[in-house]
């Protein structure tokens, strides 16, 4: 199984500490272009999944337009699963999909792409043959997490 693992992409960052507004905008564009190149590479090389281990976005209050662009990119690569764990920057409501949030992101009026895999709550797992990918916050180790020794966890 081919897997791309990445973390701390921080899309839509203010980048205000050492860059001018124009430089920050250009750098954010570069980061997003690199994200798209990674997705294109994954599809071209028949990668089964891209795993983002936290902080895809720089803030949980990021711009909706940027989040929608990410969803469109994921939807445009349906052969690649896109597994996303929330980090300390982008928060638990990564795509505002909680039933009580009152808002659900869509792509062109459709619900979230089927190849977008999130990890709500403790112990959510996705199986690829005998490979199991489980996403959880290591600060909150769940007692209900049951891993099988014969699997690659």
Where in this protein do the model-derived segments appear?
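His/Asp/Glu-rich metal-coordinating catalytic cores
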Residues: 49, 58-153
């Amino acid at each position: 199984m081919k897997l791309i693992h990445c973390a701390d992409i921080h899309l839509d960052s203010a980048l205000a500490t050492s860059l001018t507004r124009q430089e920050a905008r250009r750098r954010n564009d570069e980061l997003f272009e690199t994200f798209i190149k990674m997705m294109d590479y994954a599809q071209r090389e028949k990668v089964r999944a891209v795993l983002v281990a936290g902080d895809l976005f720089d803030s949980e209050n990021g711009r909706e337009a940027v989040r929608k662009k990410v969803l469109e990119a994921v939807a445009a690569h349906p052969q690649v699963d896109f597994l996303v764990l929330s980090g300390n920057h982008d928060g638990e409501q990564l795509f505002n999909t909680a039933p009580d949030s009152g808002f659900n992101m869509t792509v062109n009026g459709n619900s979230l792409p089927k190849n977008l895999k999130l990890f709500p709550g403790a112990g959510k797992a996705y199986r690829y043959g005998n490979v199991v990918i489980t996403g959880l916050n290591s600060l909150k180790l769940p007692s209900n997490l049951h891993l099988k020794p014969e699997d690659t966890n």
